């Protein structure tokens, strides 16, 4: 029997409920809470209308189910009948109908980022979207198989059939020596970077995903023979080539790379892939201030994962029978540049700055974790591109509270790697002085690098505070955001609670900054 907690979920003052302020919410009927939905999904009732069958759904068929009484949506390539969920949605039927009969991935990412839709809607799953993705044949002809024998296990991928309407797409070869197996992926794209390559080797299953613009190429295979846990990933940026090297446990000759698994050799829209999680070990947990901690999370052996600047990961925990997910942007263990190279560049660790909410849906559980416990972390997600800071001269980072997290590595990156930079300014809003995260380090950095300036603003300062006071406003931003020279390339990033971000964007638009000059990170 489901053990239902007495308090509502999420808790009344949790960040999830607070974050919903500003979105349209409707009163739910009695018996239509999240916990009531969980009870319904566990009741055994057929919520799909297909009596347990899973089907492939075409775009045309999906579009036909676009009514309140018959509503299907697609989320990351999977199709759900959300008709029975309509009355349980806190945003109301109108919000869900925005994605009726079409792809609702963006809608769920915006409104339900804190809930794992795969768990919440698993009893509503109808099947997989029959996506017209770029795929490479899993099988080669018998003639090609004969050729492979002369290639020492190399898959003659160049001869594989291609069903792509695209002019170019990735393909792969593999080859072996007595002690080593190498998988080579050819992306046909220059300037491939290591951060766009995610590889996991777990229990003799190799999963490699390469992000190419809005698309994703996936290798997914159960290997023919055991290999050592640790893998090596080499990226040749100019050639657009990626090599995954694995050491054999036994010096035997492989006849094939292995058994293809779900999604192997596919090339499709990144948004259509489900999030992939791996279990990571909590290595340390330290206090930053009275309510915020720095978590150091160790990636498992055989995992190659580097989070691009400005991107986040999802952290997942199972709470009261529901998989709760929450986005967090990795930071460095210290704001100062010297520490960046000694800590964050340990590619097997991620650092997460997390504010603990006593009545939050997930952070109290994170606070109770001890060193050695495991949590699940997803592949990186995000839309920020490093091209946005190429040749930039002025960077302004507008943050409120833990909205500073995406700014930390971005600040380090522009100060270290952008030669055109003339000015980087952090405009940091908090309530009280004790809320200012890494205050001493911010001040040290401003002394260490003359290009960096910090403007600390408090809305509820003590009488001893001599700095800036107030809240985000048109006049404050007008006085604080000034180009170093007329016509200089500028980037303004903003992050914080939704209301803060919405206000800030409105003020910046009124000040005449273009959409290309403003980027919003959403908490």
UniProtKB/Swiss-Prot annotation:
Arranged from A to Z, the UniProt key words for this protein are:
Endoplasmic reticulum, FAD, Flavoprotein, Heme, Iron, Metal-binding, NAD, Oxidoreductase
Domain of life where this protein originates: Eukaryota
Gene Ontology molecular function, alphabetical = cytochrome-b5 reductase activity, acting on NAD(P)H; heme binding; metal ion binding
Q: Name one Pfam family in it.
A: Cyt-b5
Protein residues bound to heme: 89, 112
Q: Show the SMART domains listed in the entry.
A: Cyt-b5
Instruction: From the UniProt record, list the reaction(s) this protein catalyses.
Output: 2 Fe(III)-[cytochrome b5] + NADH = 2 Fe(II)-[cytochrome b5] + NAD(+) + H(+)
- Coarse class of the primary localization is endoplasmic reticulum
> Where does the record place the FAD-binding FR-type domain?
275-387
Which cofactor names does the annotation list? FAD
Annotated ranges, domain Cytochrome b5 heme-binding: 54-130
What region holds the CS domain?
Answer: 167-258
Q: EC no.?
A: 1.6.2.2
Residues holding FAD:
367-382, 394-426
User: CDD domains from the xrefs?
Assistant: cyt_b5_reduct_like (cd06183), p23_NCB5OR (cd06490)
List locations, semicolon-separated: Endoplasmic reticulum
Q: Outline what the protein does.
A: NADH-cytochrome b5 reductase involved in endoplasmic reticulum stress response pathway.
Say which family it is in. Answer: Belongs to the flavoprotein pyridine nucleotide cytochrome reductase family.
| Name used for this protein in its record | Cytochrome b5 reductase 4
Q: Which organism is it from?
A: Xenopus tropicalis
- Which gene does this sequence derive from? cyb5r4
């Amino acid at each position: 029997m489901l053990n239902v907690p007495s308090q509502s979920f999420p808790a009344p003052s949790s960040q999830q409920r607070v974050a919903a302020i500003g979105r349209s919410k409707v009163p739910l009927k009695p018996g239509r809470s999240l916990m009531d939905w969980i009870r319904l999904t566990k009741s055994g009732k057929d919520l799909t209308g297909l009596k347990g069958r899973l089907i492939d759904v075409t775009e045309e068929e999906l579009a036909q189910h676009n009514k309140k009484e018959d509503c299907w949506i697609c989320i990351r390539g999977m199709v759900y009948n959300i008709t029975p969920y309509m009355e349980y949605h806190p945003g109301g039927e109108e919000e869900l109908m925005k994605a009726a009969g079409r792809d609702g991935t963006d809608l769920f990412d915006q409104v339900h980022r804190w809930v794992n839709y795969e768990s919440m809607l698993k009893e509503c799953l109808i099947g997989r979207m029959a996506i017209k993705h770029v795929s490479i044949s899993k099988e080669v002809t018998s003639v090609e198989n004969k050729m492979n024998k002369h290639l020492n296990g190399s898959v003659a991928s160049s001869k594989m059939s291609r069903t792509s309407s695209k002019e170019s797409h990735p393909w792969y070869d593999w080859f072996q020596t007595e002690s080593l197996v190498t998988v080579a992926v050819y992306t046909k794209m220059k300037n491939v970077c290591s951060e766009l390559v995610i590889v996991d080797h777990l229990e003799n299953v190799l999963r490699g995903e390469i992000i190419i613009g809005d698309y994703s190429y996936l290798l997914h295979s159960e290997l023919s023979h055991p290999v050592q846990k640790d893998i090596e990933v080499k990226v040749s940026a100019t050639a657009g080539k990626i090599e995954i090297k694995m050491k054999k446990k036994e010096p035997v000759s492989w006849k094939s790379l292995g058994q293809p698994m779900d999604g192997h050799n596919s090339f499709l829209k990144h948004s259509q892939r489900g999030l992939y999680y791996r279990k990571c070990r909590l290595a340390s947990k330290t206090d930053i201030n009275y309510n915020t901690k720095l978590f150091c999370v160790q990636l498992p052996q055989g995992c190659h994962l580097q989070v691009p600047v400005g991107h986040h990961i999802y952290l997942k925990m199972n709470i009261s029978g529901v998989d709760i997910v929450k986005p967090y942007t990795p930071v460095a263990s210290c704001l100062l540049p010297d520490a960046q190279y000694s800590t964050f560049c340990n590619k097997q660790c991620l650092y997460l700055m997390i504010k603990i909410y006593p009545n939050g849906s997930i952070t109290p559980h994170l606070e109770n974790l001890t060193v050695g416990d495991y949590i699940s972390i997803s592949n990186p997600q995000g839309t920020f591109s490093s091209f946005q800071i190429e040749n930039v001269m002025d960077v302004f980072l507008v943050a409120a509270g833990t909205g500073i997290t995406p700014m930390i590595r971005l600040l380090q990156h522009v100060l270290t790697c952008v030669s055109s930079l003339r000015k980087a300014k952090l405009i940091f809003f908090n309530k009280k002085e004790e809320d200012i995260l890494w205050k001493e380090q911010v001040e040290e950095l401003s002394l260490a690098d003359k290009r960096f300036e910090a403007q600390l603003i408090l809305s509820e300062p003590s009488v001893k505070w001599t700095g800036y006071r107030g809240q985000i406003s048109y006049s404050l931003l007008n006085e604080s955001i000034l180009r170093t020279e007329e016509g200089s390339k500028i980037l303004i990033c903003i992050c914080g609670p939704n209301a803060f971000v919405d206000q800030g964007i409105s003020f910046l638009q009124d000040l005449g900054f273009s959409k290309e000059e403003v980027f919003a990170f959403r908490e």
